[in-house]
């Protein structure tokens, strides 16, 4: 037990380090650009910051969705311990993505966000995804699981429409080359398709078990 706990702690430390590495690199590059004389973030630093943070939010969302299939395929229940952490990193990067848009793109004129939401569909679905992520992040603790009981599981099924909205946000944002959003859409389709297949398989198994065997003639 102690060995397992130590291994899990070590693994979580590595996951934290890996999850924070992109934002640490981005912060360092932003500092270089801010000081002047660096093109570390390309010709349009604001667009690059928004792109990277949004991309990592989507990646962590998909990795979170991959935890359940991974557990079912490998039989390693320990991977479930990383799901909450990865989901919170998805919310973290999504929040940084939104903050970058509000502060760097809109330059603090936050009241414009409502106009942008109504005018640009990709912002509409992106903002909706972030709003739906918020209650999942807030209720991710053991305390909330005990309070909500069965409703906790129902609430956290919101991650499925959130995934769809996030991919749609990326797809609509890209003007020409849709290969990258198509890749993430394909990954999401596989992850959701796996869940549908497992549920249908479980129903068929239950139906077979509940069907009485045919009566033998006497």
Swiss-Prot record:
Q: Which GO terms describe its cellular component?
A: plasma membrane
Keywords assigned by UniProt, alphabetized? Cell inner membrane, Cell membrane, Electron transport, Flavoprotein, FMN, Heme, Iron, Membrane, Metal-binding, Transmembrane, Transmembrane helix, Transport
Q: Which domain of life is it from?
A: Bacteria
Q: Keyword Electron transport on this protein? A: yes
**Pfam families, from UniProt?**
Ferric_reduct
- Record's cofactor remark: Binds 1 FMN per subunit. Binds 1 heme b (iron(II)-protoporphyrin IX) group per subunit.
Q: Which GO terms describe its molecular function?
A: electron transfer activity; FMN binding; heme binding; metal ion binding; oxidoreductase activity, acting on diphenols and related substances as donors
Q: Which cofactor does it need?
A: FMN; heme b
By its UniProt entry, which InterPro entries does this protein fall under? Fe3_Rdtase_TM_dom (IPR013130), MsrQ-like (IPR022837)
According to its UniProt entry, the protein's GO biological process terms are:
protein repair
Which parts of the chain are coiled coil?
none
Q: Where are the transmembrane segments?
A: 14-34, 60-80, 86-106, 121-141, 155-175
Localization annotation: Cell inner membrane
Q: How is it placed in the membrane, per its record?
A: Multi-pass membrane protein
Name the HAMAP family on file. MsrQ
Similarity field: Belongs to the MsrQ family.
Per the entry, what this protein does is: Part of the MsrPQ system that repairs oxidized periplasmic proteins containing methionine sulfoxide residues (Met-O), using respiratory chain electrons. Thus protects these proteins from oxidative-stress damage caused by reactive species of oxygen and chlorine generated by the host defense mechanisms. MsrPQ is essential for the maintenance of envelope integrity under bleach stress, rescuing a wide series of structurally unrelated periplasmic proteins from methionine oxidation.
Quaternary structure, from the entry: Heterodimer of a catalytic subunit (MsrP) and a heme-binding subunit (MsrQ).
The protein's name? Protein-methionine-sulfoxide reductase heme-binding subunit MsrQ
Q: Which organism is it from?
A: Xanthomonas euvesicatoria pv. vesicatoria (strain 85-10)
């Amino acid at each position: 037990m102690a060995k397992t706990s130590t291994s899990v702690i070590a693994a979580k430390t590595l996951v934290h380090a890996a999850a924070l590495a992109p934002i640490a690199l981005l912060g360092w590059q932003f500092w270089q650009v801010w000081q002047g004389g660096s093109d570390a973030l390309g010709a349009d630093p604001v667009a690059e910051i928004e792109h990277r943070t949004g991309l990592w939010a989507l990646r962590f969302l998909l990795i979170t969705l991959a935890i359940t299939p991974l557990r079912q395929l490998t039989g390693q229940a320990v991977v479930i311990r990383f799901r909450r952490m990865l989901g919170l990193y998805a919310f973290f990067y999504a929040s940084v993505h939104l903050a970058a848009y509000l502060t760097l793109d809109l330059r603090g004129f936050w009241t414009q966000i409502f106009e942008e939401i109504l005018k640009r569909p990709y912002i509409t679905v992106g903002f909706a995804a972030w709003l739906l992520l918020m209650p999942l992040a807030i209720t991710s603790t053991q305390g909330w699981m005990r309070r909500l009981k069965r409703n906790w599981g129902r609430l956290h099924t919101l991650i499925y429409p959130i995934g769809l909205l996030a991919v749609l946000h990326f797809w609509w944002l890209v003007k020409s080359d849709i290969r990258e959003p198509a890749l993430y859409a394909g990954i999401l389709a596989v992850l959701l398709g796996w869940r549908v297949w497992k549920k249908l398989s479980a129903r068929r198994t239950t139906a077979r078990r509940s069907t009485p065997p045919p009566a033998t003639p006497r």
